[in-house]
Amino acid sequence: MKFFIDTAEIEEIRQANLRGWVDGVTTNPSLIAKSGKDFHTVIKEICKEITGPVSAEVISLQHEEMVREGKELAKLASNVVVKIPMCEDGMIAVKKLKSEGIKTNVTLVFSPMQALLAAKAGATMVSPFVGRLDDIGVEGMQMVDQVIQMYRNYDFETEVLVASVRSPMHIQLAAEMGADIATIPFKVMQSMTHHPLTDKGIKMFMDDWNKAQKK
């Protein structure tokens, strides 16, 4: 299973990469806006930090403009994946970009049918948003399981990238289901290293060691 980090912060990417946790990066306009930097500058900086896929999102909702923006983004670095919102124009853009050898990540997917359409259009990756579904009382991970099963039934090459991750349990379930990728905020990655018994055990070992040194 591949881990992507969901951030536009260079230092978070560096720290996660230092720990061996990062296979790629996902960004969106909101994350980049928080950085206060130029959009293309941020994407270039990220692509210098990591060799894996870096998802960069188009802003337009018209397919001609999506394709134009996608081509511009793809020129920034060889590992850029163009992020396209799930909509009819988006599917036209995905098909066109695929025909030109440009990889795509269809985002804002909230149903198995949307994921199926994205795969039919030729998306490289599809991003089901689990946390936002959970927020409205729908079990997000159940949708992921359905998407994975459908893709396996028909041997789609589109990778399932679990997004809108809120907790380590989302990652565990994604791994159990066989999702290809999960994109994870750095804080959630850090929380995955902890367990009350691990923390307690480390403290006990250190206390015992310090006592022994005083004898």
Curated annotation (Swiss-Prot):
Matches recorded under Pfam families: TAL_FSA
Pathway: Carbohydrate degradation; pentose phosphate pathway; D-glyceraldehyde 3-phosphate and beta-D-fructose 6-phosphate from D-ribose 5-phosphate and D-xylulose 5-phosphate (non-oxidative stage): step 2/3
GO cellular component, one term: cytoplasm
Family classification: Belongs to the transaldolase family. Type 3B subfamily.
Top-rank lineage group of the source organism: Bacteria
SUPFAM superfamilies according to UniProt: Aldolase (SSF51569)
Protein name, as recorded: Probable transaldolase
Compartmental location: Cytoplasm
Assigned keywords, A-Z: Cytoplasm, Pentose shunt, Schiff base, Transferase
Biological process annotations from GO: carbohydrate metabolic process; pentose-phosphate shunt
InterPro entries: Aldolase_TIM, TAL/FSA, Transaldolase_3B, Transaldolase_3B/F6P_aldolase, Transaldolase_AS, TSA/FSA_arc/bac
Source organism of this protein record: Bdellovibrio bacteriovorus (strain ATCC 15356 / DSM 50701 / NCIMB 9529 / HD100)
Gene: tal
Function: Transaldolase is important for the balance of metabolites in the pentose-phosphate pathway.
